[in-house]
């Protein structure tokens, strides 16, 4: 891909007028957005309803607006030119303060109930600067970009209103086609690249139902009770009426929309911008200390008051972290790569033939994904794309201490014999697969150590003993990233303890004196060492690198037990030894070689043939799966008053959907049933009588209560079967039938995994095909 000069932010497009002709009028963003001009007729002023709070609510919103504006004027940083490269030392600083907000005066217009109830295009037409041609937005990006580059100038434009994004969300929510979702996202991102690139980062986070990477530790902390209180105060709705809305709709956005639909205010709030919504969510997350709960409540009310029509629906979902429009990680990365490739190559792109263009799109997407998996932070990704473009992305985004790497994953196999058949003619190592918590240990050049979980959350405060032992084991000062399993252990005899022992350790602010359960770090890889990435080294060289820089400390800091042989009997004995030592089985890894199907390099976020799991099976045929509870029925007889059975699902990473796979009612204790029923009671806010998520695919199975996907359970069964009732892996094996699990049994809660770390639909399909070929 030849390098292209990037268009500098703020530069206008060259005039297309010929010499001697009058310059053509440049069509501004306002002209582009005029296609769907407001069709609302003026509505006579109406009296306020008996909700007397509305006037004071608006005054309160204005007060908060003025407060935000004064804060922004005092703290807004000077904008950096695009050719400035951020020093590596500054990557760990808070990048959120780059978000700027409009200081425009609010307009004084009466909002009537008719306007509140109007369709979203009509309501959105009030904000003319952000009324996008939504018909064009749904067209092929190459068709869309022709109008974009001819009409936009990228200077002197206003920040996009949130309504433009909410309207796009509505279009995305109307389809489950990944191609159409990518098209809509690509075109909206292209619009921002031309007209408002400063809103790109905020847009990406809002689209992905997040406000920051997991390792930033930023959580909104707005629970169902606070959200309901905000709705009651903003909308003047009673608790019983609000409960009825929850029972009827189950979705926080739909509840907010219906609760606010008849609310009238004296004046129309200032239109929310994309950056304003995002920065307010950050303020909610950053509210700590005395008065934090009240501050969060006030900010939540501000967003609800300031939003109208479709805006309130999606703001409500964002506040409750329940957006679910299908813009999952892979979809967003594909959309970003396509938008930037088109923008960077806008003068040449129409010269590509179709096959060449698709190849360029695929290459660009692969570059963006590889870069993001090494540095999984949209703040850095988008900023680097804006500055460098796709062609220079890999050189400017590589693994570094302090930012966790997306972990490499192991593929599944039926048994040792099958593994040996797959790895014929390859040198490999068999390692104990310990039953602990997978973790990355990072050390920067100053000796500061951080620890991250497998789903990229920082857990440093939970393991002060690991920090201590990592410092002791290091032979000489250098920066590094190592990966291993944190395993509960009896240090007196080296005996490995059950994983449940480790889960009892406190999660925050643990001191060495507080520790009652000791851990041993069983290292199995090194990804960065002494200023250099080790990802492209074969495993055998990465091991050598580890032993050159670290000493082993018995029962505290060890390398995984491993065996290098192709002899089946020796491997079988080693497997038995692993089970005797309370391990889950073996992880078999290719040591060297350049075969792309069996890589010996470290491949972030990939489940390749270079790592193969061999686990002890429940019935010697069925490997366990990590499933997500998404619903339940009310129990009968002895289980009356509890939830039983429980509906479980696999995860589809392409759509973000949780696909129902089976009902489980075996393996639970009475105490577990009691705790589960309390956790997912209707009063908890973790469940609903209606589907909470649009992307929970239950097929022909209808539970009596729906759970918010939030935890992972390890499940074993007897067999995978084809099913017309369940949606799991639908289309991967048969177009009209999904897959289900016979005789599922609960094993344990996987507290080290989040819902998106659950077993995927493709894993289930692979297991089914292996079962058929047995």
UniProtKB/Swiss-Prot annotation:
Gene Ontology BP terms: DNA biosynthetic process; DNA recombination; DNA repair; lagging strand elongation
Catalytic residues of the enzyme? 433 (n6-amp-lysine intermediate)
Sequence segments annotated as region (Disordered): 1-25
Where in or outside the cell is it found? Nucleus
Which controlled-vocabulary keywords does the entry list? ATP-binding, DNA replication, Ligase, Nucleotide-binding, Nucleus
> According to its UniProt record, which reaction does this protein catalyse?
ATP + (deoxyribonucleotide)n-3'-hydroxyl + 5'-phospho-(deoxyribonucleotide)m = (deoxyribonucleotide)n+m + AMP + diphosphate
The family assignment reads: Belongs to the ATP-dependent DNA ligase family.
- Name recorded for this polypeptide: DNA ligase 3
Q: Which organism is it from?
A: Schizosaccharomyces pombe (strain 972 / ATCC 24843)
At the highest ranks, the source species' classification is: Eukaryota, Fungi, Dikarya, Ascomycota, Taphrinomycotina
Designated gene of the protein: adl1
């Amino acid at each position: 891909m030849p390098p292209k000069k990037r268009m500098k932010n703020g530069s206008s497009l060259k005039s297309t007028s010929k010499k001697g002709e009058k310059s053509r009028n440049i069509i501004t963003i306002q002209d582009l957005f005029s296609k769907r001009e407001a069709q609302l007729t003026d509505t006579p002023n109406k009296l306020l309803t008996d909700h007397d709070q509305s006037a004071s609510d608006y005054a309160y919103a204005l007060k908060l607006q003025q407060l935000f504006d004064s804060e922004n004027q005092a703290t807004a940083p000077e904008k950096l030119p695009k050719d400035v490269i951020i020093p590596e030392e500054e990557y760990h600083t808070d990048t959120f303060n780059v978000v700027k907000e409009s200081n425009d005066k609010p307009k004084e217009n009466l909002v009537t109930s008719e306007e509140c109830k109007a369709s979203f295009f009509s309501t959105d037409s009030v904000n003319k600067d952000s009324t996008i041609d939504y018909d064009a937005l749904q067209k092929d990006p190459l068709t869309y970009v022709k109008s974009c580059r001819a009409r936009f100038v990228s200077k002197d434009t206003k920040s996009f209103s949130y309504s433009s994004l909410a309207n796009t969300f509505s279009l995305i929510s109307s389809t489950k086609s990944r191609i159409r979702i990518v098209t809509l996202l690509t075109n909206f991102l292209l619009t921002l690249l031309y007209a408002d690139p400063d809103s790109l980062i905020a847009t990406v986070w809002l689209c992905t139902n997040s406000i920051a990477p997991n390792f930033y530790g930023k959580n909104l902390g707005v629970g169902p009770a606070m959200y309901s209180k905000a709705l009651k105060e903003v909308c003047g709705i009673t608790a019983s009426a609000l409960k009825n809305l929850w029972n009827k709709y189950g979705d926080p956005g739909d509840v907010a929309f219906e609760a606010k639909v008849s609310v009238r205010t004296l004046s129309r709030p200032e239109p929310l911008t994309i950056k304003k919504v995002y920065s307010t969510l950050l303020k909610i997350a950053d509210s700590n200390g005395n008065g934090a709960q009240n501050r969060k409540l006030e900010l939540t009310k501000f967003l609800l008051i300031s939003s109208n029509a479709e805006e309130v629906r999606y703001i409500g979902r964002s506040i409750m972290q329940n957006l679910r429009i299908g813009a999952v990680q892979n979809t967003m990365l594909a959309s970003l790569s396509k938008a930037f490739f088109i923008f960077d190559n806008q003068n040449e792109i129409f010269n590509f033939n179709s096959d060449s263009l698709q190849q360029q799109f695929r290459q660009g997407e692969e570059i963006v994904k590889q870069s993001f998996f090494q540095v999984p932070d949209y703040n850095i990704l988008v900023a680097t794309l804006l500055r460098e473009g796709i062609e220079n992305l890999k050189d400017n985004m590589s693994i570094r201490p302090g930012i966790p790497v997306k972990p490499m994953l192991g593929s599944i196999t039926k048994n040792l014999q099958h593994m040996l058949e797959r790895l014929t003619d390859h040198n490999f190592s068999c390692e104990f697969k310990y039953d602990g918590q997978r973790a990355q240990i990072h050390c920067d050049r100053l000796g500061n150590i951080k620890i991250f979980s497998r789903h990229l959350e920082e857990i440093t405060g939970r393991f002060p003993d690991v920090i201590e032992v990592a410092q002791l084991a290091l032979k000489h000062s250098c920066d590094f990233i190592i990966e291993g399993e944190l395993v509960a252990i009896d240090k007196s005899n080296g005996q490995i303890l059950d994983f449940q022992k480790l889960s009892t350790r406190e999660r925050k602010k643990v001191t060495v004196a507080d520790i009652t359960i000791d851990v041993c770090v069983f290292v199995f890889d090194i990804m960065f060492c002494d200023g250099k990435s080790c990802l492209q080294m074969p495993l055998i060289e990465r091991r050598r690198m580890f032993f050159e820089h670290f000493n082993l400390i018995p029962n505290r800091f060890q390398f995984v037990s491993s065996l290098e042989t192709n002899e089946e009997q020796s491997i079988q004995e080693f497997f038995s030894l692993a089970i005797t030592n309370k391990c889950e089985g073996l992880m078999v890894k290719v040591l060297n070689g350049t075969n792309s199907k069996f890589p010996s390099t470290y491949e972030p976020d990939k489940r390749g043939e270079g790592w193969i799991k061999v686990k002890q099976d429940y019935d010697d045929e069925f490997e366990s799966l990590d499933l997500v509870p998404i619903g339940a029925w009310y129990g009968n007889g002895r289980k009356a008053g509890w939830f039983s059975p429980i509906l479980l699902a696999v995860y589809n990473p392409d759509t973000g959907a949780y696909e129902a796979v089976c009902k489980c009612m075996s393996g639970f204790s009475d105490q577990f049933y009691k705790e589960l029923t309390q956790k997912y009671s209707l009063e908890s806010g973790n469940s609903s009588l209606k589907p909470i998520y649009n992307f929970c695919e239950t097929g022909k199975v209808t539970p009596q209560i729906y759970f918010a996907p939030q935890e992972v359970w390890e499940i074993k069964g007897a067999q995978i079967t084809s099913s017309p009732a369940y949606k799991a892996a639908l289309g991967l094996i048969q177009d009209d039938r999904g897959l289900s699990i016979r005789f599922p049994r609960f094993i344990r809660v996987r507290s080290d995994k989040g819902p998106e770390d659950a077993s995927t639909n493709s894993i289930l399909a692979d297991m089914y095909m292996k079962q058929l070929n047995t």
